[in-house]
Amino acid sequence: PFTDFGFKKLFGSEPNKDLLADFLNELLPDKHKIHTLSYSKSEYLGPSLSDRKAIFDIFCTNEQGDKFIVEIQRAKQIYFKDRSIYYSTFPIQEQAIKGIWDFRLTAVYTIAILDFVFENDNNDQHVVVKVQLKDQDNQVFYEKLTYIYLQMPFFNKTAEELETNFEKWLFVLKNIEKLTEIPSRLKNKIFMKFFGEAEIANLAQEERAAYEQSLKVYRDLKNVTDTAFIEGYGVAKQEAHNKLVNAIKKAISLGNSIQETAEIFEISESEVEKYLNQ
């Protein structure tokens, strides 16, 4: 599922709304649980044509009007947290009503499945990182804006160790490509459907080709970014710059557009063009 095609096939298609709802409900408080959901457009433009746009992997709404951005992030980005905050402003802004409006908002959730981990000074290895706006006394100031990040490299349970439905979801998301058979603890209605949808042999030929291409881009791009992003500990500035330039050129060579490459590296399109000419 750590490919665009695989992720959207399993969670972003109309017949699989029950899979997405079951997964999201493991992360949500009771008052925001999803009973029914609808998919919304995944591309949003800024207020003017010159503004950046946001392209979500999956964007959906529940019956109460709560908004959910669901994304899969394969490679570490320098300004990933900034990007995450920026993207969450779009479903907030779209709630504005012309004319008289009391500014009441519905909840907005950003849920990101990460194929990497955040830098952490205290060595905590939390699979789930939940972020909300808090005051100086560490009390939640605003409860309708929530960011939930799943650091998949920290989840290492085996099939025999799975206890909760949430752990089962984490397990299949991380291990589905490695499994040769369905573990007994995952043989329920939801997960049997998930495995059925994920079975490559059941995909149409065109879908399978799209999957293989998506998988190739993921593996190549992950290899590039794993070596390109510099953590900043004693690495010469020029060396870091050279690796960034090479990574950008590699991303373009893999078929990404200038706009897509700018999204990947969290830089402007003009900066991408500048690096390509170096």
Predicted regions mapped to residue ranges:
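Elongated, amphipathic alpha-helical interaction scaffolds
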Residues: P1-Q278
